[in-house]
């Protein structure tokens, strides 16, 4: 065990984590030159297209130290950098004794850099700072080193200068990992304790779990059980990633590897992420600390746009939730959209990734309702009800107050963009908490309603700061607020899929946007279509799509005018009858257009 090192690479998005992983793999001979490509550990096509890491990936490398010529087993976990996937970082660090914090020498310290450093410190990990991209013409080593000293508090003499692209300084990082990162603390002779870090579904093998063996040894063919659920499994296969999936006969204490296991109850497909596995014979007395259960920030209804059955859709979501434990879902029914699921996400990017994965991996096209947040509702008997759906809010009677989620937002930006960012925060009903100048950067903290930052806040922040401002946020508390539910009525019929919860200040503006969108999308009928946005019984916005009208008098070329009047009168009676029995059918294309955030 003294020759094993477990570590993660953490950083803000696009600071070079995956490129550094590539260099480690190349130097340690994990792949030959013919097999090497950029972003080796980003196995999803979606990750390569977007240029970001979405899922944490593990690789076991053998490195021969320059100092003592000894071979070391390095278990590396590459992690995402986007704020929506910070839960992935937390899970990856649970299997490690240290971390390499990568900082872009041109961009400098950003919000998620600080957030990931705090996560590592909370777990009492040894952190090595690597200043990356020093080969860029825009790199400012002195400025960024000063930022690291003032914001993070690490001496600039301890910073390793490197370029993951060219390989400069990468060997120095590997040597520092061997020297600074502690040996895994465990006992090979103790009862087995293996922590499940991640799981995913394979069409041929079933559920595959990524595990870290904290104590004991796990062999192929062992009978194991979940310490949280008590479910019993048989180990079919196990091994390591090099990054190729290599089978082995056992995983020893301190190692990180993969595991294929099946239950006698075929309906049970795997133990949950964060669970502890132990042997059925000679089990461990207590489980390892579980991951903190994360609460979704953003909720939306997902409905299949095509002919996908509810069973197929539910099966796809279940398989995705194995791979992404932060995805929450429950059944939901809409009069217009049919059966679907109410899903919880960590942010809008997380929602987009799930939507794209359902489309690519399971061929399911979706209609997604307007994203919202979880509200806390206090009713007259002082009972608290949590609401993530506008329709659920409408069904509650005796409401005393509605409380919206407030998040603590930490901004990091150059000084010259401070004024415009403050204006944006004030516009979004923000309250300033602190303002600190560090080196050439400003650390600004605001309390903001979660509902105000889930839609266009990131885009506007990046636009006004030319991409230099960064944001990291965490849930703070629920706060009483004047929230209302806007409903859409079409000829008096409620369209529940378009209901939305907003602040009363913006209700009229939001209602007008919805009504105008619907007016531009709904085709004219042979009767008037009245579109209304209402709050309770009060109409806040109204518009009419005028009827198509047939020229019933075209055959009357002369004669008595009463003939024309009679035809027009009969048409009027027919239109009135048609309006009473006629129904406006909204096709899926209308919902897809009106619920598209980019439209």
Swiss-Prot record:
Keywords: Cell inner membrane, Cell membrane, GTP-binding, Hydrolase, Membrane, Nucleotide-binding, Protein biosynthesis
Top EC class, one word: hydrolase
Primary localization class, coarse: membrane
Keyword Nuclease attached: no
Leader sequence residues: none
EC id: 3.6.5.n1
Amino acids binding GTP: 14-19, 132-135
Presence of keyword rRNA-binding: no
Pfam family, one: EFG_C
GO cellular component labels: plasma membrane
Membrane topology note: Peripheral membrane protein
Domain tr-type G: 2-185
GO molecular-function term, one example from the UniProt record: ribosome binding
Compartments (UniProt record): Cell inner membrane
Catalytic activity: GTP + H2O = GDP + phosphate + H(+)
GO BP terms, alphabetized: positive regulation of translation
Family: Belongs to the TRAFAC class translation factor GTPase superfamily. Classic translation factor GTPase family. LepA subfamily.
Task performed by this protein: Required for accurate and efficient protein synthesis under certain stress conditions. May act as a fidelity factor of the translation reaction, by catalyzing a one-codon backward translocation of tRNAs on improperly translocated ribosomes. Back-translocation proceeds from a post-translocation (POST) complex to a pre-translocation (PRE) complex, thus giving elongation factor G a second chance to translocate the tRNAs correctly. Binds to ribosomes in a GTP-dependent manner.
PANTHER family noted in UniProt: TRANSLATION FACTOR GUF1 HOMOLOG, CHLOROPLASTIC, TRANSLATION FACTOR GUF1-RELATED
Name of the protein this chain belongs to: Elongation factor 4
Record organism: Blochmanniella floridana
